[in-house]
């Protein structure tokens, strides 16, 4: 499994450098950086998308990942979910929102589970592998911080911050 993940990451890095790829329009505007020299300034580095969670599909044919872009003026980040066909290296953007979608993983039935702040707090969502059929699975007060399903998807374990007692900040 480690070799598949390493291979997928190397493939993702190689495909990301392909200048012939059609650009996907994000829901936010990424800066159009022009390099005046070969020096990588902080502005140039911040304009790059950062790859987040990576997960290989149960059939080991598709790579699931998210890309985060930072907006300096708004002082916030945007994350969207993508899939890549490992056979041909073509990527497809599944989400395109002004919210963060992250922590994505494949479920045992071939769907994609992920966290999103779309409902006001971070909750668990699920969609089909093609991005259709978006469904909110949790509505936990204050949101969740992580999740994992049992192998048969009959049980869900989620993380949540819980305040135990008052401290000096209260």
PLM regions and their residue ranges:
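Bacterial signal peptide processing site
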Residues: 18-20
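C-terminal motif of bacterial Sec signal peptides marking the signal peptidase cleavage site
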Residues: 14-16
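Hydrophobic beta-strand positions that form the internal "hydrophobic ladder"
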Residues: 60-64, 94, 110-113, 137, ...
